[in-house]
Every structure is written in C-alpha cells, then in structure tokens.
UniProtKB/Swiss-Prot annotation:
Annotated region described as Disordered, given as residue ranges: 576-609
Biased composition (Acidic residues): 600-609
Protein name: Chaperone protein DnaK
Biased composition (Low complexity): 576-590
SUPFAM superfamilies recorded: Actin-like ATPase domain (SSF53067), Heat shock protein 70kD (HSP70), C-terminal subdomain (SSF100934), Heat shock protein 70kD (HSP70), peptide-binding domain (SSF100920)
Length: 609
C-alpha cells in the first residue's frame, strides 16, 4: 500500500510528515525548513507558496495569509485578478506540501490524513476535505489536532495508563482535549475550544499598540496603509517570538510612511511586561475551555497525569504560566509544539495502512447536533463529546393537521434556540399522508462518520418513504465546483513544472555560453582552429535561439554547442597531456645526463717531494 502522509494544515504554518518504519518523520521543505508558512502569493501568473510567498508579502498585494480562518465560510479572497474560495487557497498549500513530500519519498502521493482544530464544525471539516480533493489527495481521515498530538506523544507509552490534557494554541484556533491512554487505546473524553483565538490575535494586540503610539506621536494612522500594515504584522510576529526568549525587544521600521516634512520611521521598544499587559484578556480566554473540558470529562485536576503543549503560541511565557496556574502542573515539553500534530497525523496514516499495530483512536464530536422543532427550539440528538463514529435516532411528528411535508433543519451548537446555532443544512420529507397533527411518525437519524462529517436521514414510518442527505453547508462546494478546481490545480501544477523546466533550461544555456566563451578565449593561437571555429559557430547559433526565446530551438542548439565544446575540450586535454609528457621526458633526460657526468673526471697524480 502506498504511503499515507500526515498533514498539519495550520493557520500560520503547515507541516507534513511520513511514517518510516515505526517512526514518524517530518519532511523538510525545499528551503530546508521543517514547517512551511501557510502563505500563498501570485506574481506574473505564477503561484508561490510558503517561505518565498511570505518574504514578498510586504511588497506583493496579491498575497493571502491565514486562509484557515475562512474555511467553512462563503467568503472569497481577491487576488491575481480573480476570486478564490478558501478551499482553493488551502489546496495550493496542500499541493505544495504534497509536492515536496513526493520529492522526498521518490514516489507519487495520493493519500493523506489531514488535521483540523477539534472545535471545527461540520462545514469547516467538509471544506478541509474538499481542499484535499482539489489538491489531488484522497483524504483518508480528518483527525482533530489535539488527538493527533496525543498520538505522537503516547505511541511509545501504550503500556501505561494515563490521562492527559492537550492544550493546543495555534496561529488562529485554540483547543483543549482530555484523553485517556492505555493498552493502545487513545480515548478522547472531552474537547472544548475557541475557533477565534490564536497567535494572530496576539500579533494584532502588538499591531494595535504600535499603530496607536505612532498616531499619538505623528498624527498618522498606519492602519490605513496596506503596505505599512504588512510590515507591522511581520514586526509584531517577530517581536512576539523575541519576547519568548528575552524581556525586551526593539521594533525598528525605517521609512514606514511619509509626513509633510518627509519620511517617517517607527522606532519603539516593547517589554515582555507590556506585551503581557496587552494580551492579558487573550490569556484569560484560554482558561474557560480548560475548565469546560475538565467538567465535560467529569475529571478533577488531580486526575490529570500530564499536560501537553501544542502550537507555536504555547511558547509565550504568559501562556505557559497560565497553564501552570490553571492545571497546577508543569507542562510536559517532550514534544515539539510545531511538529507534533503532523507527526501524529502520519501515525494515524500508519494505523490505516496497518504499519502501526494495536492502536485504536476514539475521537469525539466537539458540538451537539440536532434539529429545529416547534417554536424554534433546538432539540439535540447527539450531545457534544459523544465518541465517533456514532448514530442516533429519534421519532418526531407533524405540527399541524394534514401536514403534507416536514422541513428538517439540521443544526450544530449548544444554545437552546435554533436561531443561535450553526445551520448545517435543510431538507424536506414530502408526501406524508393526510392525518391529524401528532399522528405521523417521522424518524430522524443522525450519523457522524470517523471524520466528524454528518449525514441525516428522515423516514416516514407509516409509508417507509425516506430522504437522506450528507450535510453540505450553504458555504460548501458542489461536486462540479470541486471537479473544476481539481482540473485548475492540475493545470497549475503542470504550468509550474513547465515554468521550472524553462528556467532550468535558460540557466543551462547561460552557463554553456559563459563556459564556451571562456574556453574559446583561452585556446586562441593554440593551433586547433577547426574545433574553435565549430564551437564559435554553435555558440552564435545558440545565442540567436536564446534571443528568439524558442525553447525547443534553444534545447537543440544547446545540445549542438555541448557537442562542439566537448570536441574542443578533448583537443585542449590532448594538447595539455602531450605537453606534460614532453616535459616529463625532458626532465628524465636531464636527470640521466647529470648521473653520467662522472665518466669525464680525470684522476690527478700527487708526487711528494
């Protein structure tokens, strides 16, 4: 069975891992980094992903960041003169990760396990699966990020029973999951979270502070300047990271804008104490889901054996201190918070292929599911933190006499009124026989699969007629749209490969021209004019092809030049070898002469008087 890669598709950074033997290994990107910025930019018709895209974010307005925060919505992003869905942008990131995983493995990759925040709703999960499909990946499993982290942490501890709390604060989302580990079973007891809390919010607090201070000093609002804002974002992210290791950092942004008197510079120092003060409310918000998860799991703090920190934002000292204060435990630092989720996803891939034995993953649904009933009430059929996959049925009836149809309004959430929860979809069961209200028996069945994706069935028990739908939110993509986007993604991949081939050829041509010109110059007057003239002719032909830009012609002329240049090089080598041989012969003769010179010596006679 082909390898199943594990992908952590993050808000700020993404990572890809693969199982090698029994070990999960992070695959470095082409720049040698173990995580890849979740950034996509467009330039001259080219799609740029990762580090290169992030580097040009300041100067390129066609750059998209933090797209994960828009997953599961109908919001589109404008770039490159087009509008893209969040699924399409995410697919570009996935395609890039897939590409360098294939380079590393030396084989095609078609299957993946992709992680999502535990608190992602059905629409967001479906959007993630669609993004994988567009990228040419069969998504074998959607796994919750804290659960994946627990897999990576606990794989070598399957003989030990313990309860762990996973505190996962990423770039844009926050989750807390409580799991019980033992005998190879990873059982999620409860999960809670906040999909609108992450490292981006900490960055924003610094940005707001810098904007306010600069406005106070210079009377100019930098938040209205897109380029300045991107520079502020980069500086804020760097300052946040710096303050995890030092107590004070300098923020220096020369020529940030211009005033009436000329260019203005932003120079400010930010202390860790000030940063903690700015972000205090965000740190406080992390405490509520911790308490909620413990309550839902029915556990006290004393029953938690380990606290695992996941996500780059857990490096913030105030966050670490808050976790210590809230749990009464020193966090376990045995896992890399940036890499552990992708590693866990790869392990789950190994479970699917059978390479990892005796491991069972029991995940839960993060939010309650149900339907709208009379009076706009939300009636739950499946409670949050129910182990998945699961199925639950309940019988309902009509609200009016002779009602011919019932509308099934499917919802996800925790609020008592339907209007306050997230609509997953609507469908209708028709042709109900005329009868007084309360008589028809309508059975509604909810199914949640292992990926947390919902399907709903309504059945008239009297006529046995039923209606069944897999929930596709109003913000989701149709099969036709996914198909079109897949073709676009494939076309882009082909175009990118062709563009790379073109660049490589042009570089090869430049190198060949430079090397041949150097050789021709060095061989002037050395006696092999035939080969030099042939190389010069081939060189001139290649230069003409280079000017025309015809790739096929360039390729043909490059081969011709290489042949002539090779012939010239052979002649040079032969001449050099002959000269070396002649020199060696001359030196040998000289040595022989000096050895024989003793034969001409005449002995003199000495007479004593």
């Amino acid at each position: 069975m082909s390898k199943i890669i594990g992908i952590d598709l993050g808000t700020t950074n993404s990572a890809v891992a693969v199982l090698e033997g029994t070990e999960s290994k992070i695959i470095a990107n082409p720049e040698g980094n173990r995580t890849t910025p979740s950034v996509v930019s467009f330039k001259n018709g080219e799609i740029i992903v990762g580090d290169a895209a992030k580097r040009q974010a300041v100067t390129n307005p066609d750059t998209v960041i933090s797209i994960k925060s828009k997953m599961g919505t109908s919001e589109k992003v404008a770039a490159n003169g087009k509008e893209y869905t969040p699924q399409e942008i995410s697919a570009m990131i996935l395609q890039y990760l897939k590409g360098y995983a294939e380079d590393y493995l030396g084989e095609k990759v078609t299957k993946a396990v992709i992680t999502v925040p535990a608190y992602f709703n059905d629409a967001q999960r479906q959007a993630t699966k669609d993004a994988g499909k567009i990228a040419g990946l069969e998504v074998e499993r959607i796994v919750n990020e804290p659960t994946a982290a627990a897999l990576a942490y606990g794989l070598d501890k399957t003989d030990k029973e313990e309860k762990i709390l996973v505190f996962d604060l990423g770039g844009g989302t926050f989750d807390v999951s409580i799991l019980e580990l033992g005998d190879g079973v990873f059982d999620v007891l409860a999960t809670a979270g906040d999909n609108k809390l992450g490292g981006d919010d900490f960055d924003q607090k610094i940005i707001d502070f810098l904007v306010a201070e600069f406005k106070k000093e210079n009377g100019i609002d930098l938040s209205q300047d897109k380029m300045a804002l991107q520079r502020l974002k980069d500086a804020a992210e760097k300052a946040k990271k710096d303050l995890s290791g030092v107590t004070q950092t300098q923020i220096s942004l020369p020529f940030i804008t211009a005033g009436a008197a000329g260019p203005l510079h932003l120079e400010m120092s930010l202390s860790r104490a000030k940063f903690d003060d700015l972000t205090r409310d965000l740190v406080e918000r992390t405490k509520v889901p911790v308490r909620q998860a413990l309550s839902d799991a029915g556990l006290s703090l004393s029953e938690i054996d380990e606290v695992i920190l996941v996500g780059g934002s857990t490096r913030i000292p105030a966050v670490v201190e808050a976790v210590k204060a809230e749990t009464g435990k020193e966090p376990n630092k045995s896992v890399n918070p940036d890499e552990v989720v992708a590693m866990g996803a790869a392990i789950q891939g190994g479970v699917i292929t059978g390479d990892v034995k005796d491991v069972v993953l029991l995940d839960v649904t993060p939010l309650s599911l149900g339907i709208e009933t009379m009076g706009g009430v939300f009636t739950k059929l499946i409670d949050r933190n129910t182990t998945i996959p699961t199925s639950k049925s309940q019988v309902f009836s009509t609200a009016a006499d002779n009602q011919p149809a019932v509308d099934i309004h499917v919802l996800q959430g925790e609020r008592p009124m339907a209007a306050d929860n997230k609509t997953l979809g609507r469908f209708q069961l028709t042709d109900i026989p005329a009868a007084p209200r309360g008589i028809p028996q309508i059975e509604v069945t909810f199914d949640i699969d292992k990926n947390g994706i919902v399907s709903v069935k309504a059945k008239d028990l009297g006529t046995q007629k039923e209606q069944h739908i897999v929930i596709k939110s109003n913000d989701g993509l149709s099969e036709e749209e996914i198909e079109r986007m897949m073709k676009d993604a494939e076309a882009n991949a082909e175009a990118d490969a062709k563009r790379k081939e073109e660049v490589d050829l042009k570089n090869e041509v430049d190198q060949a021209i430079f090397a041949t010109e150097k050789t021709i110059k060095e061989t002037e007057g050395k006696g092999f004019d035939t080969e030099r003239d042939a190389a010069q002719t081939a060189l001139d032909e290649l230069k003409k092809a280079q000017e025309s830009g015809d790739l096929d012609d360039m390729k043909a002329k490059l081969e011709a030049l290489n042949e002539k240049a090779q012939a010239l090089a052979v002649k040079m080598y032969e001449q050099a070898a002959a000269a070396q041989q002649a020199q060696a012969g001359a030196e040998g003769a000289a040595d022989t002469g000096s050895t024989n010179s003793g034969d001409d010596v005449v002995d003199g006679e000495f007479t004593e008087k």
